[in-house]
UniProtKB/Swiss-Prot annotation:
<dbReference type="InterPro" id="IPR000868">
    <property type="entry name" value="Isochorismatase-like_dom"/>
</dbReference>
<feature type="modified residue" description="N6-succinyllysine">
    <location>
        <position position="279"/>
    </location>
</feature>
<dbReference type="InterPro" id="IPR050993">
    <property type="entry name" value="Isochorismatase_domain"/>
</dbReference>
<feature type="modified residue" description="Phosphotyrosine">
    <location>
        <position position="160"/>
    </location>
</feature>
<keyword id="KW-0597">Phosphoprotein</keyword>
<dbReference type="InterPro" id="IPR036380">
    <property type="entry name" value="Isochorismatase-like_sf"/>
</dbReference>
<dbReference type="GO" id="GO:0005737">
    <property type="term" value="C:cytoplasm"/>
</dbReference>
<dbReference type="Pfam" id="PF00857">
    <property type="entry name" value="Isochorismatase"/>
</dbReference>
<protein>
    <recommendedName>
        <fullName>Isochorismatase domain-containing protein 1</fullName>
    </recommendedName>
</protein>
<comment type="similarity">
    <text>Belongs to the isochorismatase family.</text>
</comment>
């Protein structure tokens, strides 16, 4: 037998519907995970106010990097249903906040109109420490050239440039949308989110740079949590330790992130020999990416 849904308890101080609630408010049971807490909301409260109340009740337990849906317990059906469009609280009810499941099987389709390139922390001070750094610079430059040819926006970050230096000179930043200093490991900063919001129809991010197990990994996980499909370019990302790099890529692949190569990305973006930019991309990839040993350690 299915467990009964919790009844909406009366708020302290009374017995009838709405008893104990301040005048002009309605008692609502807010359910999240295994918890259920009653609270009063204004009569006519809609989606935004319900979200605010969930955050005030459970803020420290809600992973803000995930997407959620609010559901209403429907007596008619005996179960929760997605909150109806235009819903407004008019009587005591039960609502719950449910995380949307991340789709682990992704097709990985890339189109120039729905893709942004993220170049992460390719800075001078990392040169002596990062394995195969010269090779990932070469591949990163190839990707940025491809982005310019195809009109794909590029966002670049630099980790604490005051101490770690600027992006290496071999990387041509001509035409990039944003170059941003940071101290946070992830590239997902408010300025980056604002820049993404200005680009219509963004579905995919092509991510490369350093370090694979730190800034690349944390950026990828945050983006996936926001519903963006992530492609990590294996021949354009590295770490100081190949073990750290290998296990980071394995972990990321298990979460549905696509681990790919620079040539695969560029050819997927043109998709057809008859694409008007195919010849330029073909010239770009005529020289194969360096056989550095990176791909044998994915």
């Amino acid at each position: 037998m299915a467990a009964a849904e919790p009844a909406v308890p009366a708020l302290p101080g009374g017995g009838g519907a709405g008893a104990g609630a301040p005048s002009g408010t309605v008692p609502v049971l807010f359910c999240f995970s295994v918890f259920a807490r009653p609270a009063a909301v204004p009569h006519g409260a809609g989606y935004e106010l319900l979200i605010q109340k969930f955050l005030s009740l459970y803020g420290d337990q809600i992973d803000m990097h995930r997407k959620f849906v609010v559901q209403l317990f429907a007596e008619e059906w005996g179960q929760y249903v997605d909150l109806p469009k235009g819903f407004a609280v008019s009587e005591r009810c039960k609502v719950r906040l449910v995380p949307l499941q991340i789709q682990l099987t992704t097709l990985g389709n890339l189109t120039p109109s729905s893709t942004v390139f993220f170049c992460c922390d390719m800075q001078e001070r990392f040169r002596p420490a990062i394995k195969y750094f010269g090779d990932i610079i070469s591949v990163g430059q190839r990707l940025l050239q491809g982005a310019r040819i195809l009109g794909i926006p590029v966002i670049v970050t630099e980790q604490y440039p005051k101490g770690l230096g600027s992006t290496v000179q071999e990387i041509d930043l001509t035409g990039v949308k944003l170059v941003l200093p940071k101290t946070k490991f992830s590239m997902v900063l408010p300025e980056v989110e604002a820049a993404l919001a200005e680009i219509p129809g963004v579905r995919s991010v092509v991510l490369f740079g350093v370090e694979t197990h730190v800034c690349i990994q944390q950026t990828a996980l945050e983006l996936v949590g926001r519903g963006i499909e992530v492609h990590i370019v294996a021949d354009a990302t590295s770490s100081r330790s190949m073990m750290d790099r290998m296990f980071a890529l394995e972990r990321l692949a298990r979460t549905g992130i696509i681990v790919t190569t620079s040539e695969a990305v560029l050819l997927q973006l043109v998709a057809d020999k008859d694409h008007p930019k195919f010849k330029e991309i073909q010239n770009l990839i005529k020289a194969s990416a360096p056989e550095s040993g990176l791909l044998s350690k994915v």
